[in-house]
């Protein structure tokens, strides 16, 4: 059975120490989250560099606070340093957190936003050059210029039946 852990410290240094100790005790990976504390990219980097073998995952990166190209850039970069690979966990968070805490539009349709974001992230990670003026994000010949070390699985945080259906 695979057993992973979530970040527990209040500082990146505490997280690094905790992750190293947990891996020695049998944990096989680390998951990082983001609301208004530690930045998840920094936390994921620390986790990846603290592990000897384990995977790192995001639980979750809110899709409204980073565009799909930036998400793909982060995932590809983290896949290069996480010894067991990187899992990109995405979600829509909540309207209160996205609009009230992050001062950005939550959107009218979380399902459409998720479908669009996952499609674009996967296409970027697969090396595709994208021109798109449909939906939330507009791109003009955008392309990821770094390759992931491992194929990056995309996990979805689902809060209703239609999102569960999309997640598979």
Where in this protein do the model-derived segments appear?
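Internal, glycine-rich beta/alpha segment that forms the wall or movable "lid"
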Residues: 14, 72-168
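Active-site beta-loop-alpha junctions enriched in small/polar residues
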Residues: 8-10, 33-35, 61-63, 91-95, ...
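Short glycine-biased active-site loop of nucleotidyltransferases that positions the nucleotide triphosphate
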Residues: 48-49, 69, 146
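Generic structural signal for helix capping and beta-alpha/helix-loop junctions
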Residues: 39, 66, 95-98
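N-terminal beta1-alpha1-beta2 module of alpha/beta enzyme domains
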Residues: 1-59, 152
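Structural motif corresponding to the early beta-alpha repeats
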Residues: 60-70
């Amino acid at each position: 059975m695979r057993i992973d852990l979530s970040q527990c410290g209040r500082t990146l240094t505490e997280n690094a120490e905790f992750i190293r100790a947990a891996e020695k005790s049998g944990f096989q990976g680390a998951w990082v989250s983001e609301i208004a504390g530690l930045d998840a990219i920094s936390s994921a980097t620390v986790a990846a560099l603290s592990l000897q073998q384990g995977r790192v995952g995001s639980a979750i990166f809110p899709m409204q606070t980073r565009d799909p190209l930036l998400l793909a850039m982060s995932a590809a970069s983290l896949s290069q340093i996480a010894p067991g690979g990187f899992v990109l966990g995405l979600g829509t968070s909540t309207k209160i957190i996205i609009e009230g805490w992050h001062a950005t539009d939550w959107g009218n349709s979380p399902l459409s936003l998720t479908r669009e974001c996952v499609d674009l992230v996967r296409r970027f990670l697969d090396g595709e050059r994208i021109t798109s003026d449909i939906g939330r994000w507009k791109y003009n010949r955008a392309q990821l210029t770094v390759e992931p070390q491992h194929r990056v699985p995309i996990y979805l945080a689902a809060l209703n039946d239609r999102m569960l259906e999309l997640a598979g």
